[in-house]
Swiss-Prot record:
InterPro entries: Ribosomal_uS8 (IPR000630), Ribosomal_uS8_CS (IPR047863), Ribosomal_uS8_sf (IPR035987). Part of the 30S ribosomal subunit. Contacts proteins S5 and S12. One of the primary rRNA binding proteins, it binds directly to 16S rRNA central domain where it helps coordinate assembly of the platform of the 30S subunit. SUPFAM superfamilies: Ribosomal protein S8 (SSF56047). It holds the Pfam family Ribosomal_S8. Keywords: Ribonucleoprotein, Ribosomal protein, RNA-binding, rRNA-binding. Belongs to the universal ribosomal protein uS8 family. HAMAP family: Ribosomal_uS8_B (MF_01302_B). This is Small ribosomal subunit protein uS8. It comes from Lawsonia intracellularis (strain PHE/MN1-00). GO terms for cellular component: ribonucleoprotein complex; ribosome. One of its GO terms (biological process) is translation.
Length: 126
């Protein structure tokens, strides 16, 4: 039984990129699809497809290195982390992004700062 589907998604992405796979399949849920869309908008993945209840992410590589260097789950099922607009962290001195679940949906940290909303800090990507 899976207790944290977002952690499972991040682990699948991390493991697939370490094995230099060109894509990874993840079971569909609305929040995972939203996170995948943010990764595509921010340029961390090439393409994103949805078919038969599965999200397929196609990775970006530059000279054999993955575009995503690291992923980290922040808010976990045992310890939720909430931030206000002013407390949204800078990831890797601005070279990464954080993803938040807010009242306006799942968004990246830059959009959250512009929209002046806080929320649950889901994960960091760099």
């Amino acid at each position: 039984m899976m207790t944290d589907p977002i952690s499972d998604m991040l682990t699948r992405i991390r493991n697939a990129q370490l094995a230099l796979h060109k894509d990874v399949a993840i079971p569909y849920s609305k929040i995972k699809y939203s996170i995948a869309n943010i990764l595509k908008e921010e340029g961390y993945i090439n393409e994103l497809t949805l078919n038969n209840g599965t999200i397929t992410l196609y990775f970006k590589y530059y000279k054999g290195k993955a575009a995503i260097e690291g992923l980290r789950r922040i808010s976990k099922s045992g310890r939720r982390v909430y931030v206000s607009t002013h407390d949204i962290p800078s990831v890797q001195n601005g070279l990464g992004i954080c993803i938040l679940s807010t009242s306006i949906g799942v968004i990246g940290c830059n959009k959250a700062r512009c929209s002046k909303v806080g929320g649950e800090l889901l994960c960091e990507v760099w």
